[in-house]
Amino acid sequence: MRIREGEPVAERDHHGDRPEEDAPAEGRTAEELTPDTGKPVSKLNLGRFGAGFIFFCIVFMMSGTIGSTVPLPARFNTLGIGQGETILGTMNSIGIIFALISNVIFGSLSDASHSRFGKRTPWIIIGGPIAGIGFYLTSISPTLPTIVASWSLLQIGLNCMIAPCVAILSDRVPQKYRGSMSAFYGAGQIVGQSMGTIIGSAFIDAPKTGFMIDTICWCLCGIGTVLLLPRELSAATADAERFDIRQIAMQFRPPTKGARDFYLALVGRLMLIFGYNMIVGYQLYVCMKYIGQDAKAAASTVSTMAVITMVVPLVVPLVSGPISDRIGKRKLPVFVSSTIIAIGIAVPWVLKSQFSMFVYAALMDLGYGIYMVVDQALNVDVLPKPNEAGKALGILNLANTLGQVIAPIVVSSIVVATGGYFLVFPIAIAAVTIGAVVILFIKKVK
């Protein structure tokens, strides 16, 4: 693969199988034209973008959740190399570091890539098998170092797919439709996570079968996504630069000029994800140690909450995504979603009962579903340099990972210091609220 210098290839006389190339652009606004071709997008290709995004997110979230929720933790308990919780925690902690670094690296590399298959497509394709190999090795590794190394390889493969896939929203989707496409992306993640929890639980007595199925899903994730998405334009040119390590190093500089709104979006996203994960990551313990259920009742409650989590996002994107595109606003849906999430967190804080946890699950995922609908669209709209979308979106995606890392650290500290979960709720509410307020200060989008 060759690396290029300068602006991305946008308006190129290359038609391939893209029907929108032949559509007239006269009378269309800039928001209706695809960034890479300067032409309107066809309904067929718009549908293919939606199908590709939702397929990708369902498969990668489902695959990650299938193994990590039940089969892998159960296997770690039988290895005799330490407590399962310690193994799982070490694996995730180090794996997150690789996820953080590789997301930015592959985003930058895809920005600079010059391939006849496009600048994003090759990375998405090769990421799947890398993740699949990493997961399979994790499922058979007998020692902690090999488990950690294998899981880190999975994170590299996963982010090799995520970084360029997210950048497609900026490269190839008209601004007018980004809310709707972001809706598919967000819904796919939530549905995939719920499906993974349900499917993973089914393989508690047949872990090897679950591991093989999960490995296959990982391997097919990238290629399946590429087949569903419209074909990317060639990024190869006669004057493309050969690989230059200095040129690649320059790709990793964080944006500075005109990046105020970009960093506001980063902080807002970090706070919202942090507040959201303070409760989501501890649902079982909250049910047992705060609501007062025994282990069996708590497991049943969490299982029911998973079903609620899967159903709600199926409805939200169909409504809120098109509404966001129609009204042309991103900040208002984020503020509304944050308010709903805050109310959802407050319900079990005030009312300790199983029913309050069900209400929490419904409101949390309603709010989070609305947020995910406009999240990626808002992020794309505040990019300082659209031609460096992969790198910039990779940096924004750090907020997701950091939020998930910081949340358990803070929650654990609160529980150790106070002996309970009571203070976790108001702090989570405050974090979500701060995130919403920060987003309101963005000037570049409405």
Predicted features along the sequence, with ranges:
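Intracellular juxtamembrane helix-capping segments at the cytosolic ends
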Residues: L72, C160-V173, I370-P384
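Glycine-rich segments within core transmembrane alpha-helices of 12-TM secondary carriers
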Residues: F98-A99, G179-S201, N397-P408
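Juxtamembrane intracellular "pre-TM" segments in multi-pass secondary transporters
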Residues: P24-G47, E232-V267
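Helix-to-loop junctions at the C-terminal end of transmembrane segments
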Residues: N103-F117, V316-K329, V415
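A late C-terminal transmembrane helix in Major Facilitator Superfamily
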Residues: N387-A417
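Helix-loop boundary and gating motifs at the non-cytosolic
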Residues: P35-I96, D261-G268, L272-Q293
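Structural signature of the two symmetry-related core transmembrane helices
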Residues: R120-Y136, L332-V347
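A membrane-interface helix-boundary motif in multi-pass transporters
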Residues: K119-T121, A202-C217, S412-V432
